[in-house]
């Protein structure tokens, strides 16, 4: 048997409930948040508001269902969530609405797995401004905090 949460809530607003579930249940627990930055004021992705300066007309009063793009979590937020959930003993992990292959790879790698898609992880050591590789010219690295 598996008990858990799927959909509606993003990582930030799902985690408190998962902690409570884990305290009282010893069975398998699942966690599949939506890939959106829900918060205390907007705990589900159905009522997220875009407060980042969108001035265009949208057909709804909230970003759901067709204007959620700027509300998405990044890979590091999903990775942090997956690692924290895994450390709580939650081992049925994933991402619901808004998921993509990169995020699923991030979930897997955050709990120590190497999956076939791991070969596509970016190699930042060769990035033209932020790389550490000896072949990245110093004058390019100097642009990192100015570009």
Model-derived segments and their meaning:
Residues 1-147:
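Domain-level signal for soluble alpha/beta catalytic cores
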